[in-house]
């Protein structure tokens, strides 16, 4: 996907819109995206993303360990339902520098302890 953006065959905005459309189409059935950041992702794509190796590639963060400023970070637990980080995790910062465009956060089993996701 990054190669398509890099070579101009697709814009980051077009790629972002396609990823959002797909997520919106399937999420009602699979409940994967628990916190959407679609509007912000579209703004970032339009404003220009870092030209790292993944420049323009849409990306979803697992809601465990990947703290993202302003987005709830519950680790799948009711106990953390009101926790909203004020800074990004180092890994998230590195992903952004690499050019990934964060679309939202995905479900996780409570504290990632189970092999299945039956979130609250």
What are these regions (language model features)?
Residues 1-120:
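Gly/Ser-rich catalytic/binding loops embedded in alpha/beta enzyme cores
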């Amino acid at each position: 996907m990054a190669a398509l953006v890099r070579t101009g065959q697709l814009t980051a905005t077009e790629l972002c819109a396609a990823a959002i459309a797909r997520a919106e189409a399937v999420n009602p059935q699979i409940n994967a995206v628990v916190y959407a950041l679609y509007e912000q992702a579209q703004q970032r794509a339009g404003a220009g993303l870092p030209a790292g190796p993944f420049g323009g590639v849409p990306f979803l963060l697992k809601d465990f360990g990947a703290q993202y400023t302003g987005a709830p970070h519950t680790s799948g637990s009711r106990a953390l339902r009101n926790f909203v980080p004020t800074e990004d995790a180092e890994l998230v910062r590195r992903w952004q520098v690499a050019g990934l465009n964060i679309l939202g956060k995905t479900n996780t089993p409570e504290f990632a302890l189970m092999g299945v996701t039956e979130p609250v």
